[in-house]
């Protein structure tokens, strides 16, 4: 049997989800909405491509914004 030639896999570098100048804050609603699902749930770290520290800070910021009624707890737009 012939062996297939080994192809080099190009590593696609993804852009970081949070740019260096952006600050995770409960008042930054545009940033927070990027990490919520359509139903209003917080997306997982694996889906968001965040570090553990960033995910914890993001979760706290989202919860603070929900308590202050800046973003809804659930999106029930039917």
From Swiss-Prot:
GO terms for molecular function: small ribosomal subunit rRNA binding; structural constituent of ribosome. Its main location: plastid. Keywords: Chloroplast, Plastid, Ribonucleoprotein, Ribosomal protein, RNA-binding, rRNA-binding. InterPro entries: Ribosomal_bS18, Ribosomal_bS18_CS, Ribosomal_bS18_sf. Pfam families: Ribosomal_S18. One of its GO terms (biological process) is translation. It is found in: Plastid, Chloroplast. Residues 1-20 are annotated as: Disordered. It comes from the Eukaryota. Residues 1-16 have a biased composition (Basic residues). Part of the 30S ribosomal subunit. PANTHER family: 30S RIBOSOMAL PROTEIN S18, SMALL RIBOSOMAL SUBUNIT PROTEIN BS18M. HAMAP family: Ribosomal_bS18. Belongs to the bacterial ribosomal protein bS18 family. This is Small ribosomal subunit protein bS18c. It comes from Chara vulgaris.
């Amino acid at each position: 049997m012939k062996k297939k030639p080994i192809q080099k896999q190009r590593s696609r570098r993804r852009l970081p989800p949070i740019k260096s100048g952006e600050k995770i804050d409960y008042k930054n609603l545009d940033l927070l909405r990027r990490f919520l699902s359509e139903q209003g749930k917080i997306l997982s770290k694996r889906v968001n491509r965040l570090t553990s520290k960033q995910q914890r800070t993001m979760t706290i910021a989202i919860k603070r914004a929900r308590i202050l009624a800046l973003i809804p707890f659930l999106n029930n737009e039917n």
